[in-house]
Amino acid sequence: VNARAFSLVVNRLMIALITLIIVSLAVFMATALLPGDTATMLLGQAATPEAVEGLRQAMHLNDPAILRFLRWATGLLQGDLGTSYANNMPIAELISGRLVNSMKLAGITALLAVPIALTLGITSAMLRGSLYDRCVTVVTIGVISVPEFMIATSAVLLFAVYLKWLPALSFANEVHTFSGLVRVYAMPVITLTFGVSAQMIRMTRAAVIETLDTPYVEMALLKGASRRRIVLRHALPNALGPIVNAMALSLSYLIGGVIIVETIFNYPGIAKLMVDAVATRDLPLIQSCAMIFCVGYLVLITIADIVSILSNPRLR
């Protein structure tokens, strides 16, 4: 790695750090602006004003916003996520099991979506303009156009209501056999794979086509090199950066999509935990869950940018 590539990587890491600071401030402000009073929601409408005020004092809700933000940010840096208002339990303990469930869902989806998307995207680019390419393009655009909640609802109607093959709800904590694993994860994974694969196929196809249109590929064709050799030896290595970018952007789509999927299928993941926390105005839990999603998205995008820099032939 030369000095220019190294400086670009360091610059990208610094941008990621600054972005993380801005995002943490935005998350704190967004949760602070949620309607409703946290103390009143915890105690109920029948609580006396004195009891509500006492709870507000105990939870430091009357402190200035900047002081509460600094206290929260300091805790994050020290690895202390705080205590849940609603459950009176350490947030790290609440999140740990749910985060594992969400990572399982994302991992299984990625294992399915990435090979499917790369295969269809690359072959579609190689056969550009053919019937196969047009069919792949039409299907992917159609899938991208359908909202994720529609795909999830349709899956429930088809597989759970009409065919009765799969359960409508996913109880991930009750999986003990492979068949049980398939039954629990099938519909959430199918729903997420549709959206992620469609996005990735489109971006992978565009990246490979852009590389195939470069002069050195055209020169290799004129010299009589086989199309397969050109794609494997010339096009794919130079399209690696854009393809990794496409994969990272598509997988980051999981972060938003998992919120809808976990809610519809009642999947016990971190997104479902955050939705439940919003209902009870459990601010520390909402903030911690939101930061995990933001950090996950930022890490994916940063890795994609760094791989793009390191795979650029002009920077080697």
Could you describe each region identified by the protein language model?
Residues 15, 23, 112-113, 140, ...:
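Transmembrane alpha-helical core residues of multi-pass small-molecule transporters
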